Amino acid sequence: TTDADNAALVPATIVGQLRNGLGQCLTSQDPKGSDGTPVWNSNCAGNSAAQTVIYEGDGHIRIGDRCVDVLGGYTKEGTVAHMWTCYPALESQMWDLNENGQLKNRASGLCLTIPGDTTRGATQAVISQCSDTSKSQRWTLTEASGQ
């Protein structure tokens, strides 16, 4: 399937949490933070603003008023993900959720990953080669109740 086909797997906009295969949620260090705020894993907490994501049909993942972005738009494996001002056409901020549950960055073709498949909280997310065996790359978008 193509990335465009995969994008069709997700409705236009979903509000909820992104939980990986290790039971950890994608979390912004500070949902009201500035550009460069780290994005990492942590235990999932019900209505945490730091874990409330808005997955938009164009591929943007918002937490608060910022988007999950790849540092500097780099496409090198191991580059960290962080929060940045949202730009409509910036591919380093666009993620396709594929049929394997991986969030594939459009600019790099790499997947959003918690290094080492760890459940140790506050491990900053990076982009890395997509792997069918990495539980930290298996994301489930859980819609918030009432949405």
Annotate the PLM regions.
Residues 2-34, 49-76, 92-119, 137-147:
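Extracellular glycan-recognition/adhesion modules and their associated mucin-like linkers
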Residues 37-44, 79-86, 124-129:
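Aromatic-rich beta-strand patches that line glycan-recognition/binding surfaces
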Residues 32, 76, 86-87, 131:
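Alpha-helical protein-protein interaction elements
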Residues 45-48, 87-90, 131-134:
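Short coil/turn segments at the loop-to-beta-strand junctions that recur within blades
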